[in-house]
Amino acid sequence: LISAITNQLTVPGRSTGPVAFTIFDPVGLGQNFDGIMHLADFEERVISSRIWTQQAQFEQKLGELNEHIEKVTQMYLRNEYATLAEYNAQAGRMAEKYHFLVIADFPVNFSDVAVKRLQNIAASGPRCGVHLLIHWDQRKTAPVFPHRAPGLPRSAEIPTILRRFFPTV
């Protein structure tokens, strides 16, 4: 997957467009994404300066992505556009970036705060151009999502929006 993304975005003469990646790699400490770091050779801002590995960093970066979603919703989409793609089609050179949050070995190093922020991103992010690519290590205990109705079985802890990505959980 990472190789395909890298190949598509680094074709000579092709603009990457407004795209940014935020990458979490708590187990590999960045090694799982060595190849994608070459994108920084073409455009430094495409990768948010590094690969993040620590719990506090995850909380901070997820908070920043939540703030970005708030900004896009309130300043760009308002009641005029259903999605960031619609806004960008009209914005031309003022187009807003698409963000990809890439997570390896979820839920390692995810605090309750980080899980709640991730849930908000999963629910509201796609409309605002923030998309998730998550490798869920199913050998680890699944986190308890805060927006769960009491009395639901453990399998129902994963909200519907995330179950699309993880149907076997």
How does the language model describe each region?
Residues 1-81, 91-169:
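P-loop NTPase catalytic phosphate-binding loop
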